UniProtKB/Swiss-Prot annotation:
It comes from Arabidopsis thaliana. This is Putative auxin response factor 14. Residues 126-228 bind DNA. The gene is ARF14. Homodimers and heterodimers. Belongs to the ARF family.
Length: 605
């Protein structure tokens, strides 16, 4: 079958998806296609994006196909109607795909619609990621008890060794016979005889997924889903080499010029290049602006649905040959790393808009960020906890640290620009200025310096001998103060109280200024003392937020700051030394947000 075939005469149209197949086939196909599969409805008005269709072909042909576009002067999206949908499976690899027949949108042709009142029988299904034992030559397939009861024919449990033969049909119509047995010391449900032949024929490996579907009448279906790393481009057996190289744009253009139907091949794991007309309009009206927060669905390594959160950092054409195209027009920045690949540019209809500081995105991000920063900072951050959480155990652990360990911890924090204000932002604790250190230190000091007169020994040390132990918090404070002063002023000064320690810590890191970008949950910090002007500041901010020249261009982002009097102004209007002396916090806003701030008089013009 060629993806670019042009049908010049209208065939007899069917009112259901793939009329030659049963509802059971459709359900099995969708489960094998995966959770992110989105097939348009029969008769639905859609937009067809040739760019997305091109992504299905081999990478070696993409450049040649892109070069055809200026010659053809073809639009980036085409309005069509869905005429027919055929759900199919590739013969050699069992990969699912759909043949979708499209026709240029016209009122002259009666388009069939899917019967929503069609009888839908109840089906039970389950999927399982295959283990090494499941794919072993000498093993069998272990079925979880819950799934065996729901999806497999019932066993006669009155027998000494409950056993039965079951018959399952795959997407090709082939029949597979398995022996279902309930045995073993763990009393497991197993598929034994026939399972090895199935795995060998399908070339199943560890990590693939097996799918079983059972209907109300007891009909059993079986399918597979390859692991993500085995998924390739569209097989050459589906689309010919000639069609891949020349047919996509040429056939679509011919169909629109002559108002005839054409067929496209749609793979479930490919990006959605056939988009519902209503969905596209919702996206256009939603207006995803630079700085907007979003979430996007992905399929994880275990075939479950995952969600990733990010920020839109730009809008641009994905290909120079398709101007003003919505296809992958949004440049995005992801909040955190993931074990699965994610694109740097996405289409507007692939993402969901989030309101600023959404509880979902904020809690998800901070959950991972918090665990990572706790491991990086270690016990040296325990002084940030409120008094109710800072007990003698934590302080005792800190007192065991040597001066060398303390210096290393403090150096790591300062070198990573982890100022106290930034650390506090990452944890749901009270600000340091509100902590009553006297209440924390005094009771512990009193307990430690109490004279013990009873004849008791602890770890071989007599408790009867009066002893005085220095306050561990003060010891740590003295060491941090000494290191700070030696590093900055080349001299040694001793701080005598926790209040002085706190004040000195803030003053010693004053050169680090907090930077917050619109749409990004966690801020950054920049050291203005090592920069020589606004140009270096802009370059440093681009590195921190991975903006790659977008701040210099100033066509999508603006930089603002607040001074000591909380006045907010745009960066660049003051002499650099004066700016460094008065800046309190730096902000990166989108152009739209700057306009809003000026309209509310929250930003000085």
């Amino acid at each position: 079958m060629e993806s670019g075939n042009v049908v010049n005469t209208q065939p007899e149209l069917s009112g259901i998806i793939d009329g030659s197949k049963s509802y059971m086939y459709e359900q099995l196909w969708k489960l094998c296609a995966g959770p992110l599969c989105d097939i348009p409805k029969l008769g639905e008005k859609v937009y067809y994006f040739p760019q997305g269709h091109i992504e299905l072909v081999e990478a070696s042909t993409r450049e040649e196909l892109n070069e055809l576009q200026p010659i053809c002067d073809f639009p980036s999206k085409l309005q069509c109607r869905v005429i027919a949908i055929q759900l199919k499976v590739e013969n050699n690899s069992d990969e699912t795909y759909a043949e979708i027949t499209l026709m240029p949108d016209t009122t002259q042709v009666v388009i069939p619609t899917q019967n929503q009142n069609q009888f839908r029988p109840l089906v039970n299904s389950f999927t399982k990621v295959l283990t090494a034992s499941d794919t072993s030559v000498h093993g069998g397939f272990s079925v979880p008890k819950k799934h065996a009861i729901e999806c497999l024919p019932p066993l006669d449990m009155s027998q000494p060794l409950p056993t039965q033969e079951i018959l399952a049909i795959d997407l090709h119509g082939n029949q597979w016979r398995f022996r279902h047995i309930y045995r073993g010391t763990a009393q497991r449900h197993l598929l034994t005889i026939g399972w090895n032949a199935f795995t060998t024929s399908k070339k199943l490996v560890e990590g693939d997924v097996i799918v079983f579907v059972r209907g109300e009448t007891g009909e059993l279906r079986v399918g597979i889903r390859r692991a993500g790393h085995q998924q390739g481009n569209i097989p050459s057996s589906i689309v010919s080499i000639e069609s891949m190289r020349h047919g996509i744009i040429a056939s679509a253009k011919h169909a629109f010029d002559n108002q005839c139907m054409f067929i496209v091949v749609y793979k479930p794991r490919s990006s959605q290049f056939i988009v519902s007309y209503d969905k596209f309009l919702d996206v256009v009206n939603n207006k995803f602006n630079v700085g907007s927060r979003f979430t996007m669905r992905f399929e994880g390594d275990d075939f479950s649905e995952r969600r990733s959160f990010g920020t839109i950092i730009g809008v641009s054409d994905f290909s120079p040959h398709w101007k003003c195209s919505e296809w992958r027009s949004l440049e995005v920045q992801w909040d955190e790393f993931a074990s699965f690949p994610r694109p740097n540019q996405v289409s507007p209809w692939d993402i969901e808009h989030l309101t600023p500081w959404s509880n979902v995105s904020r809690s998800s991000f901070l959950k991972n960020k918090r665990s990572r920063e706790v491991n990086e900072i270690g016990s040296s951050s325990s002084h940030l906890l409120p008094p109710t959480l800072t007990q003698g155990q934590e302080i005792g652990q800190q007192s065991m640290a040597t001066p060398m360990n303390i210096s290393l911890r403090y150096r790591d924090i300062t070198e990573d620009a982890m100022t106290p204000s930034r650390l506090l932002m990452s944890y749901p604790v009270q600000p340091m200025a509100k902590l009553n250190y006297n209440n924390v230190v005094t009771p512990i000091e009193e307990n430690i310096t109490t004279n013990a007169v009873a004849s008791f020994r602890l770890f071989g040390v007599s408790l009867a001998t009066p002893s005085v132990i220095k306050d561990p918090v003060e010891q740590i404070g003295l060491e941090i103060s000494r290191l700070t002063q030696e590093k900055k002023f080349g001299q040694s000064q001793i701080l005598r109280s926790p209040t002085e320690i706190q004040s000195k810590q803030f003053s010693s890191t004053r050169t680090c200024t907090k930077v917050q970008m619109q749409g990004v949950t966690i801020g950054r910090a920049v050291d203005l003392s090592v920069l020589n002007g606004y140009d270096q500041l802009i370059l440093e901010l681009e590195k921190l937020f991975d903006l790659k020249g977008q701040l210099q261009a100033r066509n999508q982002w603006e930089i603002a700051f607040t001074n000591n009097e909380e006045d907010k102004m745009l960066v660049g209007e003051d002499p650099w030394p004066e700016f460094c002396n008065m800046v309190k916090k730096i902000f990166i806003y989108s152009k739209e947000e700057v306009k809003n701030l000026k309209s509310r008089k929250s930003l000085s013009s």
